[in-house]
Amino acid sequence: MKPQFSQLHVLRHDKWLLSCLTWIPILLALLIWGVFSAGIARDLPIGVVDNAHSTLSRKLTHMLDASSTMSVDYQFSDLLQAKNAMIEGKVYAYVIIPEHFDRDIYLQRAPQVSVFYNSQYILIGRLISSAVVQAQGFFNAGLETVKSLSHGNSTVQGALGNAVTISTQISPLFNQNTNYAQFLVSAVVPAIWQIMIVVCSILILAANLRVYARKPEHLDRWLGNQPFKVISKTLAAYLPIFLLHGFAFLFWFYFMLDWPFQGHLLPIMIAQLATTIACMIMGAFFFFMTLDAARAMSFAGAFTAPSFAFMGITFPVSDMGSLAQFWRSLLPISHYIEVQVAQASYGTSALTSLTHLLPMASYVLPAFLAVVLAKRHLKKTEATNVPV
């Protein structure tokens, strides 16, 4: 029975493998989407400790609350209450307005407004820090404008010009709405896709070994004397399924969710083909290291665990350490994501994008090693089965 025609038989005997190839990837992708579906972080709860209780302190509080990023949900009477609220997770930050806030402003003593935020939430901390600076900037500009008008400047435009000497326009490119779903999901889902391919490749080989050889000691019943041919045909039967997964999330991102797409799908699909083959090679390599699915899964988990972190999406590659950059170069998905970003965000030429795939030629080495290991196991099997 030829392996490429017998995989339905394998799937009937391995429901877990069938699940990993069908509904589990879809469920994981939808769960990730559900986590980030809000897209933009809004109305993050903060608190205010207003020690001044004055007109200007209330105006500053209103400025903070007017920000789309923050929402002043709590007014605390003292610092201890605010600190406890942050520890309990009720607020992500609190603002302390000092006593004599109005008086110091009128006397030009520059009162200090203190802001404390929970930096354990890196993304939220950055958002709140930026929003507070922006709100305080508007507040200061308003004060300077009123001051300039009170000194006889006859036009609001002129007073505003004195208050804000340089006007800055900051325009985001490539993710203009700063949509975190677009930013994170488009990288997390491919990372999960890579893990699923490597894991499923191990499960496929383990299932074929179990169904057609029964035991590792009878490996020759499955691989015969042509391990490369049998392994290639076995895994090739599942190649369309993995490619279908890849095309499905592209269709979901750029057609159903209608995220901006500047380039062409063909280079990305070529990158998906190369990535799928590379991941299947790594799965085969891990499996034939031990012929044990559990230990192979451990190797695969250690190998693919930092996929998302090392992609270079949330942390620049240039700032990574040498070890991180080396590990990143070993991950197929890190080369794929370069092509996806180049096409989806930048619209670069197909040839320029596909040059990111050149390092993937090095996966010939683990492919060769997988075959060598398979032959080694076959020799052990032959030695074991030699009649005495």
Describe the function of each predicted region:
Residues 20-21, 232-233, 299:
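Hydrophobic core positions of alpha-helical segments in small-molecule transporters
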Residues 1-181, 383-388:
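Extracytoplasmic/periplasmic domains immediately adjacent to an N-terminal transmembrane anchor
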Residues 157-167, 245, 330-341:
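Peri-membrane helix termini and adjoining interfacial loops of integral membrane proteins
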Residues 56-60, 201, 339:
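Hydrophobic alpha-helical segments typical of transmembrane helices
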Residues 240, 251-252, 259-388:
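Membrane-spanning alpha-helical segments of multipass transporters and channels
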Residues 6, 10-13, 175-184, 222-230, ...:
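Membrane-helix interfacial "entry" motifs
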Residues 26, 30, 127, 196-200, ...:
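Transmembrane alpha-helix boundary/anchor motif
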Residues 28-30, 171-253:
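Hydrophobic alpha-helical transmembrane segments of multi-pass membrane transport proteins
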